[in-house]
Amino acid sequence: MKLAVIPGDGIGVEVTAEALKVLRKLVPDLQTTEYDLGARRYNATGELLPDADLAAIREHDAILLGAIGDPSVTPGVLERGLLLNMRFALDHHVNLRPSQLYPGSKSPLAAQPDIDFVVVREGTEGPYTGNGGAIRVGTPHEIATEVSINTWFGAERVVRYAFALAQTRRKHVTLIHKTNVLSNAGAIWTRAVETVSAEYPDVETAYCHIDAATIYMVTDPSRFDVIVTDNLFGDIITDLAGAVTGGIGLAASGNIDASGTNPSMFEPVHGSAPDIAGQGIADPTAAILSAALLLRHLGRDGDAARIEAAVEADLASRGDSKVVTSEVGDRIAAAL
């Protein structure tokens, strides 16, 4: 297995090391190439995602990312120039966010049974395409626009991914949108679900407005199995999903090219946390679960399940003990 590794900034370096420690226990032939991308390189050279690095990354089976971001860089520079640029260049049109409440996780919904759902978020369209602008800036007549781009091609392929995933789970797909207001984009998403659902007669479907979905995610999260949604609503709902399942410190994600043309990228949802970087107290669990997600994407379901079981056991046994980054990685690797 050829793996491109982007440790990135802050605690990204530390948690990625633990994820690799776990991966190497299960993948003896793992070949890794590390890419220095993020704040350090940008501050040193002004480079964000050089063409040569992007071309080299394309040659790998998958990408493991730590975290990107540092106070020394203006907000938005790394996000747009590196993360979004890579997402578009590698056609990572599916953002996959599993949300499961593990025993021992600290959650406001710890008493809720059976919180286990997946959000399938469209990753390359919506209002994040940079289609917009502003005129008369700084005047009382300033006007700003952010155009949301939605295509049949983009929606249908993400919906199709969601239905295929639901087929392997509890066979239920919920579309989240705001079709009563965003009628044009909503029509595309609704038709995509109706069209694809005809090919999956045993998969049930449901619809929620985004505002109602936030209520249900807190009051009745077990109603969800696979959620499919657009880029903006997915961005919002996945952070809420992280909160109800123990916090984004436990949340893994995948940025996936479902066609397999480009390597998909897997990363913890949390940021670079520069305030605790270098102290060895960052929880690497989300990075380790991202490694499990990576293995499942590459067809190694058994290995992924072993990591997830080891994580579940580790979380259940921690109690109130303080997290030591390397010790978490050691325990989970030893359990394999």
Swiss-Prot record:
The keyword Ribonucleoprotein does not apply. NAD(+) binds at G271, S272, A273, P274, D275, I276, A277, G278, Q279, G280, I281, A282, D283. One of its GO terms (biological process) is L-leucine biosynthetic process. Its EC number is 1.1.1.85. It catalyses: (2R,3S)-3-isopropylmalate + NAD(+) = 4-methyl-2-oxopentanoate + CO2 + NADH. Substrate binds at R87, R97, R121, D211. The gene is leuB. Catalyzes the oxidation of 3-carboxy-2-hydroxy-4-methylpentanoate (3-isopropylmalate) to 3-carboxy-4-methyl-2-oxopentanoate. The product decarboxylates to 4-methyl-2 oxopentanoate. Keywords: Amino-acid biosynthesis, Branched-chain amino acid biosynthesis, Cytoplasm, Leucine biosynthesis, Magnesium, Manganese, Metal-binding, NAD, Oxidoreductase. Belongs to the isocitrate and isopropylmalate dehydrogenases family. LeuB type 2 subfamily. SUPFAM superfamilies: Isocitrate/Isopropylmalate dehydrogenase-like. One of its GO terms (molecular function) is NAD binding. It is found in: Cytoplasm. It comes from the Bacteria. This is 3-isopropylmalate dehydrogenase. One of its GO terms (cellular component) is cytoplasm. Its cofactor is Mg(2+); Mn(2+). Pathway: Amino-acid biosynthesis; L-leucine biosynthesis; L-leucine from 3-methyl-2-oxobutanoate: step 3/4. The keyword RNA-binding does not apply. Signal peptide: none annotated. PROSITE patterns: IDH_IMDH (PS00470). The record marks Y128, K178 as: Important for catalysis.
